[in-house]
């Protein structure tokens, strides 16, 4: 994942983490990208042809003991610590409230209201609780699971709640309205629900189950999938004592933005995005695979959302208070988006390489990956086929 367009402070944080823990750089770089976007929440928005906040759904892929979990855990620890403090305050206020309610009615403080728990991270929950949680924290909540497989398995666990279709609509911030018997109705005008977690490569096929390849769920995921994720030798190096604390301060700078920032694209950024959009549309039109068409369609959106994220990085690190996304920021966002195009193709190969999936055009993927400059060896490895087969397909495709 390219980080050359990140501020120097964040590049230093990423490189220090890699030096100490010997994990693929993609894992920590993506974790920085995601935690930055989540810290921004709904407070910075691009108001252009379409409105976009940096809403990301991220899937970090790696083998067991590859180090895929810890980088995101470190970057998200800021929010977990905030939740811990908030929960302790909630318990204290709940105790006071219950004590007050035990008094005779005439002696109660009539102005005292039942406390609420403000939280960022959602792990184990029932689907109908999300709107209630979100109504308390309207700047953004995150469904965060170490293993997304467990989260996917939970779909339908609660009386066929339709959680999957609800999640699909929240990606584009469609209103959420929950009405339940004996419950107060909840309405969320513009949901801001982030998603992050990990998955092992051999379990990727589960992503496509229950119609998720066809209904657009799979194409909404940004996949972090480094080429090498083997467990590395032990390193005696340690992070500097203030490294994580300083990163928390960085996230706090974004999390505590009070007044919403509304952005526009500079002329240069708009030209860059327009040119890239047209190239992306051409690639989509030339592809016959439904899943990949869906991916390319979401990349249009993600390029802008990532641009807002990069803007937030520069706002805090470089004190860039302009309310325009400039050409440099857009170029960085496009480069990162292209990384996620490549990983989507890699995921496609892992999920759909089974010969039983006859309806899916593997040859089209081979030709397309070759057009991106991937070697025959890399293509064969990604699709789990022989290099001679790749060579044969490319020879026929070039005739």
PLM-predicted stretches and their roles:
Residues 1-399:
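Phosphate-handling catalytic cores of nucleic-acid transaction enzymes
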